[in-house]
Structure formats: C-alpha cells, structure tokens
C-alpha cells in the first residue's frame, strides 16, 4: 500500500493503512507483560466458559421453543424468541466497541455485561407470559453483546499475536460444543423437568443452568488482572470524556432503526397485512433511520461507533458479511428443525435436542413426515461440518489485521452484522413459516375439523390435543411444507456465505513476522517466521 502524505493528520484507525506501523506494534507487543501460569489459565478458562454459555443459551432455547409456544399459546412469536436476543445484542454491539476502548476490560465492561446476560436468563426463567419472556431475551442479548466482543478483546490482551489464532480456534470449538450439547441439555430439562420455574419441581433448571458456570466465570475474572492494549485512566477520572466519546447520538439512531425494521418483518402477515400502512411505515422508517445513522457515522469520522475508515478494508467487510449469513444459517435450522421433530415426528424435546446437534439445509428442505432416520441424521452432519468451517477464520483475520487498540471496534462491527443477520433471518423465517402454515392449512381446510387460527395459536406441542386421524395427518403435512419453505431461506443465506468468504483471502500468516502488517490491498511483511498457525486472511 502506498504511503500517505506525511502532512496528513492520522486518525486512530488510519494506522492499519501503513505497513511501518506494524513494526511499532511488534515492538509494543514485546514490552507487554502477558500473564502466565495459573493466572492466564484462569482468564482463558473464564473466556472459554463465557463463549460456551453464550452459544449454549441459544441452543437450549431452540429445543425449548416448541414447549414455550404451547405454554404461552404463542406460535407466532417463535421468531422473536431468538430474534429478540439478537436484536438486543445488535443494537448495543457498536456501543460495546467504544466502551471497551475507553474503560477497563475487566472491571467496567466484561463483568457488567456478563451480569446483565445472567439477569436476562433469570427473567426468562421467571416469565409468566410471552412478552415478559421476550423482554428477558432482549436483556440477555444486551449482555451477550459485551460478552462476545469482550472475549475476543481479552484473548488479544493476554496472549501474544502468534498464539491467538490457536486459542481462538479452541474458543470457537467450545462455542460449537455449546451449540451441540445445548439442544440435548435443553431437551432433557424440557422433557423431564419443564422449561422454567413455574411448576412444583425443579422447573428452573432450563434457564438457570448457566448460573453455576456463570459464577465460575465471574470469580475467575474478579480475582485476575487483564493487561490493557493501551493505558487507561481510572473510570471516575475519564467518565465525562468517555461518555462524550461513546457516540450516544449514533446509538440512539441505530436502536430504533433495528427495532422498526424487525417489527415490520414480524407484523407482516401476522398482526397486519404486508401492504398495510403499519408494516410499510415500520420497514421504511427503519431503513430511513438507518440511512441517517450512516450519515451521522460519516460525519463523526474516526470518533464514530462504526468508523468508515475501518470499513474500507476488504477483510473487515468480508468478515462482517460472512458472519451475517453464517450465524443466520445455523440459527434458522436450530429453531425450525426442533419444530419439525416435536410437531411432525412427535419426538420428545430430548430426542429433538439430540437430532439437532448438527444442522443442514439443501437436503433438509426435502424433509417430510416419512423421512427416514438415516437421511435426517446424515443431512445434519453434512451441514454441521460445513458450518464449523466458517466459524473461526473471520475472527482470526480481524485479530491479525487490526492494531490492538482498535480490535474492540473492529470486532463490534463484525459481531453487530452477525447479530443483525441472525435477528433478520429468524424474524424472516418466522414470517415465512407462519404465513406458509396458514396457507397450507387453508388449502386442507376440508380435511381439518379445527380452524387454522386455532391450530396456529395452540402451539407446537398441542397439535395432537386438537386433531387426530386424517385431520392430524393433514396438519402435519402443512407443518412439513411450511418448514421446507423456511429451509429454502437457509439455502439462500448459506450460498451468501460462499459469496463473501473469499474476501477473507488466502494469506499464510506463518510467513509473516508482523501479523498486523496484513491489509486489505494485499500488503504483507517479509517472510521471516515459520512457527505460527495458518489462517485465511485478506
């Protein structure tokens, strides 16, 4: 990359445009006193457990959702049970990058966000109706915004660059373990205990399960020191300046933009027709507000929540779009395969959880009430392997591209779009499912003795309480057809992962001494080291 004019005043993110800056980063890294021994072990264990809980929470919910819809008579809210979580996370994600850049990683950020996440889980466990449960999911999502960003920021702070890729892979592996075991754990509690604490027995276990591990995470973080990428003054000393630098006006624009757009998708075809003024107004209003947000971010320059200078780099926007579609593909399948097994196959939540421990789409769109066990197991294993291949590379790319002080903001961009993608896809999948189910039930009205509205309102686990015999067979066919149409959405988002992932590039970081010298135009340091881990970068 060509050098910029020396008279140009460089902003805080311009350093990633200069290869000579990487040598300064390397020198600074050698001066950092990284924790070692039991201290680094405790810190990394807490980060790994936090990632495990983050993904476990998502996976437990996917299996418990059919039982929740029956408890609250709220099948039309399925999209919001997952989407509300992603909405809370996405709305706060850009702000977390600014917070981590201003305040201590441990004392004022990671722990606070983790506590918020745990409080959201407690509220979900205590929920007595669908709106209360959705509010709990939003609060948990807000906490997860800081957890996901903080985990990556912490790894960058406690490990030298050449070790970060390896541990990031291990960390993501634990996250995938949470996705794999979550459906089984959630199914076991839903089957044998119930999904929350409103029954006489141990009904709290489903959503309280992360509290014991959460106490371990909090304890490990509380009694250890995490080195900062750059010195930070005491919180009270910089509070006024820090608040001004958080770009709260930008936050007040992105929040309503996301909420309006997702509400429009949720209301369309459910509470209001798609061509109603309410739906059109929400979607258009959300888009217009997002446009104002982009203008505001451009005007703020390097002080914005989402600095445009970072978005100029191919690796960053490629990673953002890859994760936008990647998490979407996983969550859509998690939620609707659970409905397939519990509604159509009449499996218990435990059996359903075991079935969705891996996920798949192109072949899954062929599922029917008579699909053999060998097929649905094979389909899911195939996609489970594929989805795992896309997990770690975008995060490792960002860690090796961006100077340490800017990693929180870069990660905030990636995770923001990841969560926006998940929220939009879940709400869109819910719209496709609910509208398709109503259409399919209407087509089979002569075979069904109960109104389509009553079937939709009853929830997944209550179908067999309403209909039986030939009417039940017709209802199950309608469910299967609606789920197949949701899987077509999964095919589309999976293809988009293929479209954007090549933007991560194919650079071998084993041959690069100063990893942060890698930039979007292909600049690369001299080949001097051979002992680090390879990763696709751009």
Curated annotation (Swiss-Prot):
One CC-aspect GO term? plasma membrane
Q: Tell me how this protein is used.
A: Asperfuranone provides anti-proliferative activity in human non-small cell lung cancer cells.
Q: Where is this region: Disordered?
A: 1-28
UniProt subcellular location: Membrane
Q: Which GO terms describe its molecular function?
A: transmembrane transporter activity
Per the record, what phenotype accompanies loss of this gene's function? Strongly diminishes production of asperfuranone.
Q: Name one GO biological process term.
A: transmembrane transport
Induction pattern: Expression is regulated by the asperfuranone cluster transcription factor afoA.
Concerning InterPro entries, the annotation shows:
MFS, MFS_dom, MFS_trans_sf
How is this protein situated with respect to the membrane? Answer: Multi-pass membrane protein
Respond yes or no to whether keyword Glycoprotein is given for this record: yes
What keywords are annotated for this sequence in UniProt?
Answer: Glycoprotein, Membrane, Transmembrane, Transmembrane helix, Transport
The residues that the database entry marks as glycosylated are: 192
Q: Which PROSITE patterns match?
A: MFS (PS50850)
| Gene3D superfamilies assigned | MFS general substrate transporter like domains
Q: Where are the transmembrane segments?
A: 40-60, 107-127, 138-158, 165-185, 206-226, 248-268, 278-298, 321-341, 378-398, 413-433, 486-506
Function noted in UniProt: Efflux pump; part of the gene cluster that mediates the biosynthesis of asperfuranone, a probable antitumor agent.
Q: Which family does it belong to?
A: Belongs to the major facilitator superfamily.
Protein name, per record: Efflux pump afoB
Q: Which gene encodes it?
A: afoB
